[in-house]
C-alpha cells in the first residue's frame, strides 16, 4: 500500500491565497508549461494573481534537494516546509497550493500532528496504521478533485505538518510501513479521538448502521463492565458520575469534566450557537442515547418555546461556553464546545428558583473507534496489533 498523496494546503479560512511565497535552501526548479528555470539557494519566489507564469496553467516547484518552505502560512511549527513537489494554480477565488508527496513521507508529518510524539511507541504505531488506513480510504475522495487534490491538511481530514517530525513517530511509520486495517478485504476508515469516558460508541451516533461498520463496537474501555445499560438515562447517569480506576483513560484530564452555567449564560449561548431562540431555558431533556451512552437527541424547553437538537456535533456546539470554567481532572479550562455528548444535564436551583444547569460528562471526541489516550495506556502492556484489534473488532 504505497501511493502518492495530493493535498491542498489551507490558510486559516480556506484553500485560497492572495499571495504564495516559497523558498528552498537548496534552490528549486520552477516548471511552467513546457519551460523551466532554476532559483538560487535561498531565493524567494512570489506568486500572485498577476503572475504571468499562470498563463501557462499550473506551476510546479521541485526542490533540488530537501524541502520547500511555504512562507505564506503559519503552523504550530512556525513556517512549514514540504517534501515532494508543490503545484501552484490560479482560480477565480485565488491561488491554490497542492503538495504531492509519497504516503509514507506524508504520514511522518501526520502522526506527530495527530498524536503527541512522546506517547509510547506501540500507541504511535497504532496511530500510524490508523492514519495510513484513513489516508487510503480518502484516495477515492473527490472533495478537492477540481483542484487536483484528494484532501486538505486540516482537521477536516488529517492534520498534516502542524507539529515537528520526531524520531519516535518516524520509527512508528517505518516499523508499520505499508500496513493498513482491513475488514473482509476492504481498507476501513479508522476513526479515532482523544479520550474516552470509559465507554466507546458506534456509528449509530452519526445516523449510520452497525451493519455497515461492524468493526466499531460500543464497549467498556478497560474497566470492569458494570452491567449498566447506557442507553437508559438513569443508568448512564450512574455511570458518568462514577469513576473506574481500571478504565484506560482514568488518569486523563478529560476522562471526567463538569461545568455549571447560569440560565442567562446557557440561554444566550444556545441561541447564539443554534440560531434558535427559545427564551430563558427552563428544561433540558435527553430524548435519545445511542449504544455506549452518547446523547444524540436533546429537547430544550424555554419560556418562548421548545426545540430539539438532534446531532452529536450540534449538541456539543449548543451547550459549550468559552466564557465559563469547566472542571476537569487536572484543574479548570474553557471550551467553546462540549468535549463530548457522553454527558447529563441537571437543573441547579436556589430554593424553588431555577438558577442554572450543571453539565457532567466524560471523554473528549466522538467516541467511535480508538481512544488515543487509552491506546497510550494500553501500550504499556500490549502490542499495537492487540490494541487495534480491541478498538476495530474483526479487522486484520
State where each predicted segment sits.
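Conserved, single-site charged/polar hotspot
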Residues: 2-6, 10-396
